[in-house]
Amino acid sequence: MVETFLASSAKKFYEYLLENNKGVEVIPHRQAEFKNPTLTIHLKQKLFGLENVFLEIDGKDHLIEKEGDVEYVAYDEDNLVLILKFNTPEFYKDSFILKSDLKFLVKNVEQFFISQTIALPTKPPFSPKLTSLLPDLNAEQQRAIMRIFSHPLVYIWGAPGSGKTQRVLFQAIEKLIEADKKIALVAPTNNALEQAIKTLIEKFDEQGIARESILRLGIPTLEFSLKYPELCEKTKKENNLFSANPRERIKTANVLAMTLDGFVARYGGLDVEFDHIFLDECAFAPLPKVCTLCACNAPITLLGDHKQLQPVCEITQSDKQKDNELKIWGYSGIYLEHIFSDRLFEEKLDFQYTKASVLKQTHRYGNNLASILNEHIYQNGLRGKDEESGLYFLDTSKLNTQNIKHNGEKNISPAEVVGVKQVFNSRFDWAVITPFVNQRKILIRNGLPYDKVFTIHGSQGQEFDGIIFSPVILSYYLTDSHNPQALYALNVAISRMRKKLVIVCDYDYWIAQEGQFIQRLLLGSKPYKEE
């Protein structure tokens, strides 16, 4: 049985993390202030998620959860401030450790498959009348919507800006709300979930759909809870709908929005029957967790782009190759049907049950960039808009690095730090992205704002008007486009931009890298001149 295999897989992954001292990350903080019963913590870094954060006090872990010993009050992602409330204040001690523990989430997956049965969805989706669709839908988007309502398992594949969320997802959810159906909107991370909800709410407001049709389960960021209090499961705003009966809101809301980990933890207690499930950013979601969505026999629509980042997995490549029960944690959710067959480990995405719909037109990129992405990555006829994307380079080969602070770390480029500082200014919505952790550190050490400098994984789910990209060096795992995973990661970095991309690098070094994606981008770029 699939459930037995998945439960065993989760148990083995848990033991692997335990034996190899992995999965636990101490979250550093700058300072903390306790005013009974509230603890305010100023963090040094963003939290990846909120479902697996603990406070260790006197050697004991306290899960931060609703109505637990410690619960969330607010998380201000922009200012890196976490506010907690102690329901049992005597537990507090000045010497505490804030940490995230992946093992807790893996244990939840094991418990889920012990208690639930799963199967590929067979229930036909609700079929609404599609005579009143948005007037600006293109033919590909219309076909995608029709496919969602004609088959139990559908994958909508599209590059950034192709309308997966703003057009296809919104239109499908709108039709289901009109019919008073129950919908689960799921995403692999807090950030991805809130981005999807924000996009939907913009369309809801345009079309006159009540915001309270959506209920966001779990812990929102402070910015989200202040902007959309009526959507949140718990908020101190007086006008939120939860002042009455939380259980009633779960029953009456058409859309229950939650992270994938939230679905795993709460599905058994929700006591609702979903008519349709949508998983956004499915390619970034680990396959075992995505399998939990199959407990409902509700139609499932996967939305995403498998030519971008795959799930983060703490299992080494060599260990994955030795054991299939560990290996599946590196597979993404688009392989959902494969786990119910003997085709999963053939390393081939070969849909037989899943119906795919491809969106090949993007409004994010000009044709100049779309053609490069199609040539190297998508190879599906990707088209952009007529207006060109701004592609530029700044050559660092002759820049003076004398004043750059560094300790000779591996995988850094002081010259690129100089170049980035020449381009970056606060008058434009810039973000700096580099594949290398050490390069990010020295960029910040030399004056770049920490909240504007990202590794590729850290930039996932965010957008900026301009991206300054610091590639540092050719690396098989991070920048060598002959490695598909590195190529897809580079695609993520590029796709964070709305208007401009500036590649700050040693131009001659990269131009000599024949056949590389970065070389092709440089060939299509112009020298950068500050406007």
Residue ranges of predicted features:
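Walker A/P-loop NTP-binding motif
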Residues: 165-179, 199-201
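Short hydrophobic/aromatic beta-strand immediately N-terminal to the Walker A/P-loop
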Residues: 154-157, 184
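Pre-ATPase regulatory/linker segments immediately N-terminal to the P-loop/RecA-like helicase/translocase core
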Residues: 1-146, 209, 217-237, 310, ...
